[in-house]
Curated annotation (Swiss-Prot):
One of its GO terms (molecular function) is rRNA binding. It comes from Clostridium beijerinckii (strain ATCC 51743 / NCIMB 8052) (Clostridium acetobutylicum). Part of the 50S ribosomal subunit; part of the 5S rRNA/L5/L18/L25 subcomplex. Contacts the 5S rRNA and the P site tRNA. Forms a bridge to the 30S subunit in the 70S ribosome. The gene is rplE. InterPro entries: Ribosomal_uL5, Ribosomal_uL5_bac-type, Ribosomal_uL5_C, Ribosomal_uL5_CS, Ribosomal_uL5_dom_sf, Ribosomal_uL5_N. This is Large ribosomal subunit protein uL5.
Length: 179
């Protein structure tokens, strides 16, 4: 059991029951999955760029990402249908908690001028989206080995019904929200 899973069961669940007055322990929202997406626009000209993005994401997430492809051809963007344009990885269970712990305790504090993440990026259904501008904040990525600084989107999918519940869940887990 990971450190964050233990914290969830021992501290977060009782705190959420107290705050929201759940009658059943199964009503307490939990993290369902974390999706990390890396869109690589330059991949349309150079497939090698996509390979390095896949390698970076493999190091960061600890599992191999799946390629994302263009849904339809767009002449203005010079892309064809089914052309690989990025990669994404879906983390669940232990991998998800390991990544969330690493993100909140190590990676986010390494961001330049970090004052906390926005608390307005909830989607209305209890899911939280977070954009990162550079992959260098993760300890697995070596500065000398990267060819280009790339960003990524990280989506926390929870079982919470409202944004308020999801915000409290993530706050109790240790997400550094800006005041």
């Amino acid at each position: 059991m990971t450190r964050l899973q233990e914290k969830y069961q021992k501290e977060v669940v009782p705190a959420m029951i107290e705050k929201f007055g759940y009658k059943n322990i199964m009503e307490v929202p939990k993290l369902e999955k974390i999706v990390i997406n890396m869109g690589v626009g330059e991949a349309k000209e150079n497939q090698k760029v996509l390979e390095s993005a896949v390698n970076d994401l493999t190091l960061i997430a600890g599992q191999k990402p799946v390629l994302t492809r263009a849904k339809k051809s767009v002449a203005n963007f010079k892309i064809r249908e089914n052309m690989p344009l990025g990669c994404k990885v879906t983390l669940r269970k232990a991998n998800m908690f390991e990544f969330a712990d690493k993100l909140m305790s190590i990676a986010l504090p390494r961001v330049r001028d970090f004052r906390g993440v926005s608390s307005k990026a909830f989607d209305g259904r209890g899911n939280y989206s977070l954009g990162i501008k550079e992959q260098l904040i993760f300890p697995e990525i070596e500065y000398d080995k990267i060819d280009k600084v790339r960003g990524m989107d990280i989506i926390f999918v929870t079982t919470a019904n409202t944004d308020e519940e999801a915000r409290e869940l993530l706050r109790f887990l240790g997400m550094p929200f800006a005041q």
